[in-house]
UniProtKB/Swiss-Prot annotation:
Native organism taxonomy: Archaea, Methanobacteriati, Methanobacteriota, Stenosarchaea group, Methanomicrobia
Cofactor: how bound: Mg(2+). Can also accept Mn(2+).
Keyword Hydrolase attributed: no
Active site: D148
Subcellular location: Cytoplasm
Catalytic activity: acetate + ATP = acetyl phosphate + ADP
Name of the protein: Acetate kinase
Organism of derivation: Methanosarcina acetivorans (strain ATCC 35395 / DSM 2834 / JCM 12185 / C2A)
Gene Ontology BP term (one): acetate metabolic process
Residues reported in the UniProt entry to bind Mg(2+): N7, E384
Major subcellular location class: cytoplasm
Residues at which substrate binds: R91
Function description: Catalyzes the formation of acetyl phosphate from acetate and ATP. Can also catalyze the reverse reaction.
Amino acid sequence: MKVLVINAGSSSLKYQLIDMTNESPLAIGLCERIGIDNSIITQKRSDGKKLEKQTDLPNHKVALEEVVKALTDSELGVIKSMDEINAVGHRVVHGGEKFTSSALIDEGVEQAIKDCFELAPLHNPPNMMGITACQEIMPGVPMVAVFDTAFHQTIPAYAYMYALPYTLYEKYGIRKYGFHGTSHFYVARRAAAMLGKPEEEVKVITCHLGNGSSITAVNGGKSVETTMGFTPLEGVAMGTRCGSIDPAVVPFVMEKEGLTTREIDTLMNKKSGVLGVSGLSNDFRDLDEAASKGNQRAELALEIFAYKIKKVIGEYSAVLNGADAVVFTAGIGENSASIRKRILSGLDGLGIEIDEEKNKIRGQEIDISTPDAKVRVLVIPTNEELTIARDTKEICETEVKLRRSVSI
């Protein structure tokens, strides 16, 4: 079975074609600058051969048509025709309260995704564009929506509700939803395997650290708490997002600076975080280099980032009544030894100690704890695309079995 995984953004379309017989990607590709000048599509095969093409990509449908051409290219493609693709899995950021798991896309699912547009205005509309484009180009191929929020639907009400008038929840669905669920689910499951324990018996704190960062407490394979909330703005400080702050800061700054609601939203989402503090960059490599040369604001930005995460690890240790492991994943979590060291230093009281040499190893599954540490520290590269492909395969196969049983 071959599954095409689609992650459609506002001006980009990431994709992977995965052969599910051995769960390996045949091709990984990206359409960039959709609807903008100088659009480009790049695709890399499993053997390393690369296709790169500059072409006009006015919308997602045209972008997907180029994906079809790339996948079936006589020289650099990986399949002879699109008939070889059995199903398509779509990343959808927000599923609201409706979806506790992935779902086969039909009219009802499409409407539910649209109903969540106001909850994820930057993400769900382009996600839906990707679905629509696929349906037009690949009619009849089963498609599955895999929701970032679904994994967090096991969080209890006392953890996901805000202490606001309850009517706001009833009217507008204002509550914590959580994000990066597909990543947290994948690494939590891998952590259980690395620990040699059944998933149901493992308690882990998963740290997805990239330009957007979130931490999740996972108990027995289920999310019980997470840092991101109603939107991905809540939680720890991030690349350009401020994370959790005193809410009274918002009207205060709006009044002092004369900002509109859209402008304050942009300030908190795109001009804050380590970028806002450092005044330099949201790239942690740049900040590391600047801090090593004595840039005090770069150092402060890194200290804030690490401190906020350290606090959450302590908090979630309490939520779980002790953790078996702390997991680091995503771009920064997998690759930055210095950030991991900043976060974990001084946590020996919680049973967390790392081996300095093992911590230097980048981008591979590894236990970087000292031999006698009570809590294991694991670095696990995330694989959201494989998780989406697995869900898509499982749901499509279940649907086929159901149809067969009904016809009998």
